[in-house]
Amino acid sequence: MSIEVVSKAVHKNARISPLKASQVLRLLRGKPVEYAMYQLSFMNKKAAVIIKNVLKSAVANAEQKGIDPTKLVILEAKADKGIMFRKWMPRAHGRATMMRKNTSHITIALGELQEATEEAK
């Protein structure tokens, strides 16, 4: 059996840190799409909601190409560092400190399971 990438979805600058998103993505890598959607629906994490939307988008991209969604497997699931939001927070005695909010680029690539033919062997 061989797997090739058929669709991809990216969410840029998601308002979650890459570390927290990658904890959820690590559980999904290499799993079938139906299983991953089921797992995400019961996960009690903010990242699960964001990742589920990205996964739905990747499945929709595959369906546009006419691929059966039941044969899809998650090949690549990663969270890269995005831009950092900075804003000033007032403090005592007229000072201010910078607040930093991390963002991440969440990428999910799906592949289709194909059975090897007898000629390829």
Curated annotation (Swiss-Prot):
A biological process from GO: translation
Pfam families the UniProt entry points to: Ribosomal_L22
A cellular component term, taken from the record's GO annotations: cytosolic large ribosomal subunit
One Gene Ontology term of the molecular function aspect: rRNA binding
Gene3D superfamilies hit by this protein: Ribosomal protein L22/L17 (3.90.470.10)
Domain of life of the source: Bacteria
Protein keywords: Ribonucleoprotein, Ribosomal protein, RNA-binding, rRNA-binding
Function: This protein binds specifically to 23S rRNA; its binding is stimulated by other ribosomal proteins, e.g. L4, L17, and L20. It is important during the early stages of 50S assembly. It makes multiple contacts with different domains of the 23S rRNA in the assembled 50S subunit and ribosome.
Family to which the UniProt record says this protein belongs: Belongs to the universal ribosomal protein uL22 family.
Subunit structure: Part of the 50S ribosomal subunit.
Name the UniProt record assigns to this protein: Large ribosomal subunit protein uL22
Gene: rplV
